[in-house]
């Protein structure tokens, strides 16, 4: 989908051995800054690791998933998008002690129903089956991390500035260790690198005042510019330029420092 949309506007489009889609859009002039902007195409999900029979599969989570919220979630499995549900022992069959404990993935199963074992196999991947919905000014969907970044990067390729050589990296395997971005950076050898991704909104009542101050992002508050995270400390000159550019264009935003990635 991404290749089809960006190819007419790009000077070069290629896919590397890892699966990254690497797009070059050259500016006008010589010796222009080489700016790589990355957004990841992968999403969190699951991998089937054991067939328990009767369409029931044990699975491992892939990426940063809150396992407390998995029971009862609908999923789709494999290239054929086989529908399934994540199930566990019925609540009325559990002991009071069991009800106090958080269910980990080892206690959950993906259930494809009778005959499901003939439709899927160990090694197949699964994702959430959530459908996009509009809720007033907001949208509800799975994988907005990082479909929002991918959408914005597509728009940047289609309306690229002419004063830089734009190196757009639509990457893979971000959710399991930033692997795609590392490979793309070695390929492009950019002078400047920027990642477009999502970040939590800390504007809910269960965050106390101190935590809201530390993580000051919130919905409708504009983009967040990371000062540091668990993998990098941003170049001060680049941060300053981003902040000043946003102010000059009247774009509200936030600066943020985070001790780890996710």
Regions found by a protein language model. Give the residues of each.
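N-terminal hydrophobic/helix-forming segments and targeting peptides
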Residues: 1-262
């Amino acid at each position: 989908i991404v290749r089809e949309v960006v190819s007419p506007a790009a000077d070069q489009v290629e896919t590397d051995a890892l699966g990254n889609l690497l797009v070059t859009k050259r500016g006008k002039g010589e010796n222009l800054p080489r700016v790589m902007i990355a957004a990841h195409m992968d999403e969190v999900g699951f991998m089937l690791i054991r067939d328990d029979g009767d369409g029931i599969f044990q699975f491992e989570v892939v990426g940063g998933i809150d396992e407390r919220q998995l029971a009862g979630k609908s999923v789709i499995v494999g290239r054929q998008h086989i529908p399934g549900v994540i199930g566990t022992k019925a609540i009325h069959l559990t002991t009071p002690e069991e009800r106090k404990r958080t269910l980990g993935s080892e206690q959950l199963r993906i259930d494809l129903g009778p005959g499901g074992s003939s439709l899927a196999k160990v090694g197949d991947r699964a994702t959430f089956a959530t459908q996009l919905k509009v809720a007033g000014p907001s949208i509800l969907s799975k994988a907005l991390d990082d479909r929002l970044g991918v959408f914005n990067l597509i728009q940047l390729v289609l309306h690229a500035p002419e004063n830089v050589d734009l190196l757009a990296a639509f990457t893979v395997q971000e959710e399991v260790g930033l692997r795609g971005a590392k490979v793309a950076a070695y390929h492009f050898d950019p002078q400047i690198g920027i990642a477009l991704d999502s970040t939590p909104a800390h504007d809910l009542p269960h965050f106390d005042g101190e935590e809201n101050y530390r993580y000051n992002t919130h919905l409708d508050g504009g983009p967040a510019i990371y000062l540091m995270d668990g993998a990098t400390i941003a170049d001060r000159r680049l941060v300053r330029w981003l902040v000043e550019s946003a102010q000059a264009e009247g774009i509200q935003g936030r600066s943020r420092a985070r001790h780890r990635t996710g």
